[in-house]
A protein has these predicted regions:
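Short gly/ser-rich loop at a beta-strand->alpha-helix junction or flexible surface loop bordering the NTP-binding
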Residues: 25-33
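Short beta-strand->loop micro-motif that forms the acidic, two-metal-ion catalytic signature
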Residues: 45-49
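Catalytic core of pol beta-like nucleotidyltransferases
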Residues: 1-23, 35-40, 51-113
Length: 113
């Protein structure tokens, strides 16, 4: 991953911390950037794991969307975050192919997954 991208991802994680605070458990980069086969037009796939219920997560949806939009505009990126309950992710990681893939190829940017 290019050094400039690493710096931008660190800033994005800092913004995620501001939104979720102590509820944030992990931020995982997955997809083409984690595998190293990205192109100039690749999106940046981010999994956010939090210590919140699905209902509680909904309260943060707009804030995450607004922050991500502003971040993408500022850095000319296409960050695509998915926020999930850490409990849900851990429960289903061995059963859901998508979660398995995130766990297998993911690069931990913050916390522990």
């Amino acid at each position: 991953m290019p050094v400039i991208m690493q710096s931008q991802l660190e800033r994005y994680v800092d913004e995620i911390k501001k939104i979720y605070g102590n509820h944030l458990k992990a931020v995982i980069l997955y997809g083409s950037y984690s595998r190293g086969d990205f192109r100039a037009d690749s999106d940046v796939d981010i999994m956010i794991l939090v210590d919140l219920t699905d209902m509680e997560l909904k309260r943060y949806r707009h804030q995450l969307s607004e922050m991500t939009y502003d971040f993408n505009e500022e850095y000319d990126l296409d960050v695509k975050p998915i926020a999930k309950s850490n409990e849900h992710f851990q429960k289903w990681v061995s059963a859901y192919p998508f979660y398995k893939n995130v766990k297998k190829e993911g690069v931990l940017l913050y916390g522990a997954a």
